[in-house]
Amino acid sequence: NPLIVHIADLNALAPIVKEVPEKAKILAEKFWPGPLTMIFEKSDLVPLETTGGLNSVAVRFPSDPIAAELILQAGGYVAAPSANTSGRPSPTTAQHVEEDLGDAIEMIIDGGPVGIGLESTIVDFTEDVPVVLRPGYISLEMLQEVLGDVRMDKGLIKPDSKVHPKAPGMKYRHYAPKADLAIVEGPTEEVINAINQFVKEDQANGLQAGIIATEETISRYPCGTV
């Protein structure tokens, strides 16, 4: 997988890419610093080891002040993956990182819990029309509201293992918590009663339960996280 190059200053973008399209500048002004990664044609300053052998580079400008200071102390650029095992969800606390990676890393910088538990949205600007390669916190609708024509990558619908991924998280499954999932179907009252019974049984066994509900039924679940 290619790595994301993290910057802490907009002026750091130009030296590592061949060109910054106008639409990319618009997104940078709207969403940077923040959970948005953009892909450009790389300059000669970016080694192929960083890009996974591709001629493009993924760049992100994070909003966390501690991350920004780390990047600046490292010389203005940090090429790195997310702090989680491939296929696992993004951590939101230092404890999550320690539980997932353990002795595989030498140090954790604890900046407190983060507010967003999703990977950054990745938008490819190497094509004529911007393409979302990885969905994230910034939705397709939010991007289209700013730019107009933005498309979803066809590989998100039908992944092709033979295609070299242009961005992290495209090759393997993503957002995969270690949890059982049950879909309850049927008449509304029966669904509500069944879900409440499932949650009570889980809690009696010392488990935590989360419920995804509609606005019409959300008040009918007294237990669990709704």
Write out the residue ranges for each language-model feature:
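Active-site-adjacent structural elements in enzyme catalytic cores
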Residues: 1-226
